[in-house]
Amino acid sequence: MRKYRRILLKISGESLAGESGYGIDAGVLESFADDIKEATDLGAEIALVIGGGNIFRGLSAAAASMDRVQADYMGMLATVINSLALQDALERKGIFTRLVTAIKMEQIAEPFIRRRAVRHLEKGRVVIFGAGTGNPYFTTDTAASLRAIEIEADVIVKGTRVEGVYDSDPEKNPNAEFFPKISYVDVIRKNLRVMDMTAITLCRENTLPIVVMNMNIKGNFTRLLKGEPIGTLVHVGEE
């Protein structure tokens, strides 16, 4: 039994780096590809957005005096590098994959056309959205929210390295409180770092649920799709 039909999976660039903190860890890439293959074998339609923080962070570079717009474009290119790496890992497992970018790169990717992206999903292809929104000042979290709404995804799944949403950083505070469910309003009120404010607001306005879960535990993604209570569900709640 599959709980969700169409899912947008958001993976941070840092998670691809593994223990090294930089670059792309082949083992992590392989593990993510295995999880996505299991999901497609269940009949789920999978779209992905990958960050670029393992290669370049535009906001950090801007803080170090680089022009913010230039830095953000460099960050967008970093997401394309990660997307190409994951596309290769998926295709080696026999999964038909399309890389779709917000910036035209005709030699390596299709331009983003909503109807075409949806058609790929309907045909059982995995769609990777690269280059963010194509505009500076917007994060890949916001890009994930936007693309999820455009393709009419049932849910955004944000893969992290912790179990879900806590009231403080569980890696620093062993007594941090875990939330199995939480409303968008409480996320905003408590200033919890689920996604940036623009991304959360987009999801709230379009009643798009978010599940935050530990992507580093093998099989978690598949268990979530089967309806097991994995991670934290961010939803409308009582407003």
UniProtKB/Swiss-Prot annotation:
It is found in: Cytoplasm. Pathway: Pyrimidine metabolism; CTP biosynthesis via de novo pathway; UDP from UMP (UMPK route): step 1/1. It comes from the Bacteria. InterPro entries: AceGlu_kinase-like_sf (IPR036393), Asp/Glu/Uridylate_kinase (IPR001048), Uridylate_kinase (IPR011817), Uridylate_kinase_bac (IPR015963). UMP binds at G52, D72, T133, G134, N135, P136, Y137, F138, T139, T140. Residues 18-23 are annotated as: Involved in allosteric activation by GTP. GO terms for cellular component: cytoplasm. Allosterically activated by GTP. Inhibited by UTP. Its EC number is 2.7.4.22. GO terms for molecular function: ATP binding; UMP kinase activity. The keyword Cell membrane does not apply. One of its GO terms (biological process) is UDP biosynthetic process. Pfam families: AA_kinase. The keyword Cytoplasm applies. It catalyses: UMP + ATP = UDP + ADP. NCBIfam families: pyrH_bact. Catalyzes the reversible phosphorylation of UMP to UDP. Belongs to the UMP kinase family. Homohexamer. This is Uridylate kinase. It comes from Chlorobaculum tepidum (strain ATCC 49652 / DSM 12025 / NBRC 103806 / TLS) (Chlorobium tepidum). The gene is pyrH.
